[in-house]
Amino acid sequence: MRNFITALPIVLLLGFSFVSFMFQFEHLVYFRLALGLFSLVGLYMIYKMKTGIRYFIIYLYASWIVLAAVTAFEEPIFSSFFFGGLVMTMGYLTYMLIYLGMKQDRDANPV
């Protein structure tokens, strides 16, 4: 059950980024591909890292900046799709930080 709870948000995020191609395919195409790839790489990094939280945080914020830049490149600023892309980017950042906190809590050595 714990693994299901851990995996559910990222599955929903990946599902949204890839399944959403069925709707409004001409908007945020590169953004959705980048979101899915950054999510997969971030998940892999979280599950494989033993130390090096600082590197993951650098990766996370760098990917957040790239996603925001891709959104600004693909959509006119202040359009509804632009704000939708920024909201999905913040969701990605939030999910990854939640996963990082869950990993830290799970891997902590009891005193």
Swiss-Prot record:
GO terms for cellular component: plasma membrane. It is found in: Cell membrane. It is a multi-pass membrane protein. The chain crosses the membrane at residues 4-21, 28-47, 51-73, 80-102. Keywords: Cell membrane, Membrane, Transmembrane, Transmembrane helix. This is Uncharacterized protein YdbL. The gene is ydbL.
